[in-house]
Amino acid sequence: MVNVPKTRRTYCKGKECRKHTQHKVTQYKAGKASLFAQGKRRYDRKQSGYGGQTKPVFHKKAKTTKKVVLRLECVVCKTKAQLALKRCKHFELGGDKKQKGQALQF
């Protein structure tokens, strides 16, 4: 279980800052895939009409987790940076700090 605080004081690469400032932390989420990307247009054109599935569908999945990516936004200049963490099954943002002698809860 990885628990990350919602704010973090870290280096800001922004032109105004270039020093350690407070950053707001959120979890990165991939955007919706565009229907107009060249690969998607080609794929849709190929799939249309008769003839079933035209490209191989990937089945041999090897990984059970994804790497967690944090999105850090500087509170001073609003510059955004991304920071990849290690793989983990349980990720929590701004959860309660653990106390001594207490059982883990999911």
UniProtKB/Swiss-Prot annotation:
It comes from the Eukaryota. GO terms for molecular function: structural constituent of ribosome. InterPro entries: Ribosomal_eL44, Ribosomal_LSU_eL42, Ribosomal_zn-bd. Keywords: Antibiotic resistance, Cycloheximide resistance, Ribonucleoprotein, Ribosomal protein. GO terms for cellular component: ribonucleoprotein complex; ribosome. This is Large ribosomal subunit protein eL42. It comes from Cyberlindnera jadinii. Pfam families: Ribosomal_L44. Belongs to the eukaryotic ribosomal protein eL42 family. PANTHER family: 60S RIBOSOMAL PROTEIN L36A/L44. One of its GO terms (biological process) is response to antibiotic. Disulfide bonds: none annotated. SUPFAM superfamilies: Zn-binding ribosomal proteins.
